[in-house]
Amino acid sequence: MTTLTSLQRSEAQRNHIVDLIDKACLRIAPIWPLDSFVAVNPYLGLIDQPFDTVGRYLEQTVGESLFMDHGWFADKIAQGEITDDDLAQAAQQLDPSISLDTIKQQLAVHRQPAPALPLVTNELDRRDAPPVSEFVIEQVSQFMANYYDRGQALWHLPKEASASLFAQWRRYTLINRSASAVGLKQVRQHLLAVPSDAIDALFWALDQINLPESRLPDYLFTLLKTIGGWASWCRYLHFQAGLHGESQHDLRDLLIIRLVWVALVIKETSSAGRQQWRAKLNDWFDPAKLVASPSATATASTKAQSSRIDEILLAAAEQAFRRRINAGLNRQPADAPDQQAERPTVQAAFCIDVRSEVFRRHLEASSPGLETIGFAGFFGLPIDYCRMGESEARLQNPVLINPAYRAQETGDPAIAQHRHARQSRGAIWKQFKLSAASCFTFVESAGLSYVPRLLADSLGWHRSSLPPDAPGLTPEERARLHPQLVKLDGGALSTQEKVDLAEKVLRGLGLTHTFAPIVLLAGHGSSTTNNPHRAGLDCGACAGQAGDVNARVAVQLLNEAAVRLGLIERGIAIPRDTRFVAALHDTTTDHIELLDLDQSGIESDQLSSLTQALKQAGELTRLERLVTLEAQVDTVDAEKQATFRGRDWSQVRPEWGLAGNAAFIAAPRWRTRGLDLGGRAFLHDYDWRHDKEFGVLNVIMTAPLIVANWINLQYYGSTVDNLHQGAGNKVLHNVVGGTVGVIEGNGGDLRVGLAMQSLHDGEQWRHEPLRLSAYIEAPIAEIDKIIAGHDMLNALINNRWMHILHIDDNGIPHRRHAHGDWRPEPI
């Protein structure tokens, strides 16, 4: 194997290397900031490869696991949850050559991690000094936190607007003398020789590292994963730029920074140390020497079989879960409970979020004349939201799409002035508390004034943290502000545009006939305190925001007389007595707040009946949830207990969020009505018989289903390997950059994913890491056509990152196997 130096490389060869860099960067999944924290598939850049192949690759490059330990599966087998039939069927589908005895023998073997790709920084780690490997990560992380600060820091890193991320880091490192503390005495002198241009610095670093080009992809990926949190942040910036047709190279610069650090460490390493590192590196790249099991004679085939057995165990657990669902789906319309032959009294639309499944089930049981609908929580409105008096808008639709319209906050301009004045005073007070001149005397001079608030927070008397739109406003002022639908440039929509949008909303909801007198559109949000990841509990379809804005805008649109008149021409006749009402479902307390009732026109007796049904459903839902959260549930005053959890600033588990999610069902509601799905299924109402051109099906499979998969795999990754794909211990979180993210403790890499407390109750896992099983009641040919026409969906299904199942007219699920082969599922 040969390597080329910078002087020997042609322009084409240089471009090829840069292309390898960019491809390595695309292997990293993005992470959204805390104020819009949405779930992301942490394996997004790897879905072009089969599931088990990625499992081996992650284990061998960075020591990351893609599967639960064997003990977890063994417990399920011992408890009878996973049967021998489940194991045998999974083996038959994935690798018929593997017998049941082989699986059980492997189950008894403790899985040994493969040696991760060796890094030169590890060769300098000594017991009598801080680890060089940790120092490098810490130095990069501190710089990145300063560079990307979003208003948290009072002392800012000086930077030039035109300078690149790499150029800023180089200047920062030249004046930072901390490397000497870990024995790197000559870093500054070596760094002076590094070119200030990022691409030139890249080739300087590669000359020092001196790796054959064939080994670069694995090496580059491994380096990025050592700073995976900040790499994910830069990938987010790259992703956002791509949505707007722009280019962004911070992630490339970050990888070059990491490569330069490797080169600097190589220059500080003794000749013997370099030789030792290169010997280990050569062994790692030699398949005959790479060992992933206790036996030194392990071969590539046995390692592949071990990984395949791990996937067989996972597939068997998923089969066991689906068995419980399959039996419930096997019904005819006449078999479903409480089928309405007449006009329903209320139709209530909720987000497909798994938490809504519990509330919908209890609401339907509380009011037999009521129907519920499942739909993505942004209600099909591609909008952003701009507060009055502000110029920047926030996203209120899925992060995969750009907004087409704007919800503009309107009301008395004086309210916006009051808000600005109060927030300005708050900012001044905060600066006074934290500034270098006053911070040391602040506690002595003003500390006693905080005693009442400390007591209120500690005893749960204080309200939960305010939603993003509430700071600076009184409740009365908030009630006087309303969102108004406008164009992105602020112009008014024509009636035709409103009718087009209203038609899309109604057809997406499946509401084109038989309207109830009251149609409730309920967005959802949460109410927690001292929780940096609060947005992760809000609506993912609304970009990590509460869905009340979308619900209010949709209601205004659908109650407008001119819009209803235009809908008649589209074949949708809304009765004159039908009124749409907006609501907000608080998933922490399971309280439903009805919004803008002064504009609803609902009769008092109708309102009273609806309020009573919502209250009763909330009580039953709270009791069901609190059993999994509290050792003792107050059945008399569960609402107070749930509210206290949201207000308690020491509470690390105010709610379980979407823990337990494992299924997605797109079918008519009668198919699932009355089924107890345990808050584990995303429920999207869909009837293919009313979807003539299957446009709604296409939207469901390429938007809500993808979002559900992202959520599912975020929870999966955070559970199977919280060190690499999770956020660690929530108690130790410190916010970085205002809204950028969190670190664990006082240093280290940016953490991604979910904290352990969101997945584990201290004794057992509350999330069962299973790949999503998506049930769709639609013709197989149409499902196959959509899969074939959507690259991401195709990769997710064909490479086994999720399961897709068709429900036939008899209620029998058929699962899609390799090469598009559909087979009936056991019931």
From Swiss-Prot:
Annotated compartments: Cell inner membrane
Name recorded for this polypeptide: Probable inorganic carbon transporter subunit DabA2
Span of the signal peptide: none
Annotated Gene Ontology cellular component terms: plasma membrane
Keyword field: Cell inner membrane, Cell membrane, Membrane, Metal-binding, Transport, Zinc
Phylogenetic placement of the source organism: Bacteria, Pseudomonadati, Pseudomonadota, Gammaproteobacteria, Chromatiales
GO molecular function: zinc ion binding
Impact reported for residue 524 to A: DAB2 no longer restores CAfree growth, still binds Zn(2+)
Membrane topology designation: Peripheral membrane protein
Subunit structure, as described in the record: Forms a complex with DabB2, possibly a heterodimer.
Phenotype seen when the gene is deleted: Required for growth in ambient air.
Similarity comment: family membership: Belongs to the inorganic carbon transporter (TC 9.A.2) DabA family.
Disulfide bridges in this chain: none
InterPro entries: DabA
Its job: Part of an energy-coupled inorganic carbon pump; its substrate may be carbon dioxide. Expression of both dabA2 and dabB2 (DAB2) restores growth in ambient air to E.coli deleted of its carbonic anhydrase genes (called CAfree, deletion of 'can' and 'cynT'); neither dabA2 or dabB2 alone is sufficient. Rescue is pH-independent, suggesting it transports CO(2) and not carbonate ions. Together the genes allow greater than normal uptake of inorganic carbon by E.coli. Uptake of carbon dioxide rather than bicarbonate has been suggested based on kinetic calculations.
Residues holding Zn(2+): 351, 353, 524, 539
